[in-house]
Every structure is written in structure tokens, then in C-alpha cells.
Amino acid sequence: MRTLIVIPARQGSWRFPDKPLTLIMGMPMIEHVYRRSCLVSNVDKVVLAICEEKLEEACHKLQMEYVMTDREQPTAIDRVGEAARSLGYTGHDDIVINVQGDEPAVPPPVIEFVSELLLKYPDVGCANPVERITDKTELDNPHRIKAVLSNNERLIYLTRQSIPSSEFDIDNEATFYRQTCVMSFRGDFLQKFCLMPQTNLELVEGIDMLRLIQNDYPIACSIIDDATYPVDVLDDIKTIENVFQNDKWIPKYNIIKK
């Protein structure tokens, strides 16, 4: 079994242009993601999946491995699939982990957990954990993708709206979850994903994982206790800077996987 971590990154985000190279404590965001990914145990390779010369120049300067991909890839997962394909990680026993390029504070144990979750279910081709929503303002934030999961550790649905509905929840018993933007795929299943046409729910919600849900493919899903802090808008940088004040992973960034 081989494990590959791919970090998709793109400069042309309409919500936050030039986001990957935004400095956080003097270091570009994607470098934080890359260095943290390199701290994950039992990983054979870590690469960035990019499509722009500016990011390629940054990768050279910062000594980060990368794969150039097609600018026209429709989603981050499709870009990850192209990178995995070019590196030969397409077998059933290959594990490809997608760590989004806007997750600068992702704890390495979360990435390890996503791989373990996939291996727990031999009949499943993809795994994507969730975390509890403790700040109820996130329910109205369309950048935070809300999730519903089954009692059997399967992802039922993803949406940018508040879910489940709390209109009848007079005792405040509802528990809310959001997607963690780290997911794992078996190598052959990731290529199968890339061959599927985008679905209408995927396009309406702007959530690529709905391609699997709408085509009835199970997604292993479990709750993590570690918090992640995605960067969707410029104001999120302040949150990351606060988190980094007590971060234990930054001092370990000098450990690099080849």
C-alpha cells in the first residue's frame, strides 16, 4: 500500500484572490499546509496540485514538490485525481488524501485519521470526516459546508444551508456538523470519480463530494474531535493567527518528506 497526499491550490479564487500565497506569520498559506502534511506518518509522497506559473515559482522557491495540472479542471478533487494519475497512484491499494490548500491549521493527526477511516471499510472508496459545529453563527455561513451522517458512519448529505432543520427542535437537541476539508480515496475509485459527469446537486451547491452522494456511492464518515480552521475569506486569517499562537506543529516544519 502506498499513500499520497495531494494539496490542490489555485490563485484564481473569486472569494479570495491570491489566497494560496497569503502570508500567515510570515509564511505563505500553502506552505503551512504542505509542511503540516509532511508531518503525517506513513505517507510516501506529498505534492501540490497547481495550474499557474505564479504558484509554480513559489513551489520552486520554497522547495515544495508539485504537479502542474489542467487549468480547466472543474473541481479540486478532479485536480487531485489528475495529479494522482500523473504520479501513478491509481491502484485499489493506493490511498490518495486530498488536503485542501486553504487548511493552514490542519492538525496532522486529522490527516492520518482520514486514511485510517478509509481502511476501516474495505467496501468504501472514499472517506470524509466531519466535526461538530460549536459556534452557531457557522450555520448561516455559506462557506461552511454542513453535513448529515448516518448511524453507520456514512455521509448522507452536504449543503451550505443550515441542516437539520431546527424549526421543531424546541428542546435544542439537534447536533450540527460541518465537513472537514480533508478526504481520502482509493486510487482506482478517485479515477472513477473523475470520469463521472458533474451532477446537478454538485453544481447547485458547489460541493464536489455530492457527485458521489447523488450517484449512490457510500462515503465513510466519522466525527473528529480536533478542530480545523478553513480560510474562505480574508477575515479568517485573523482566526488562524490566533490559533497559531499555541500551535505545536509549526516548530516541527523542518521535517520534510520526499
Over which residues does each language-model region extend?
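N-terminal glycine-rich phosphate-binding loop and ensuing alpha1 helix
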Residues: 2-50
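Hydrophobic/aromatic residues located in beta-strands of well-ordered beta-sheets
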Residues: 5, 46-48, 96, 127, ...
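Short, acidic/turn-prone active-site loops that include or flank metal/cofactor-
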Residues: 11, 70-76, 226-228
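Short, high-confidence coil segments that cap the C-terminus of an alpha-helix
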Residues: 43, 91-93, 121-124, 217
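A conserved hydrophobic position in a structured secondary element of the catalytic/binding core
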Residues: 50-51, 101, 106, 185, ...
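Short phosphate-binding loop-to-helix
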Residues: 53-116
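Conserved core of the sugar-phosphate nucleotidyltransferase
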Residues: 106-196
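Conserved alpha/beta core of the MobA/IspD/sugar-nucleotide pyrophosphorylase nucleotidyltransferase superfamily
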Residues: 174-258
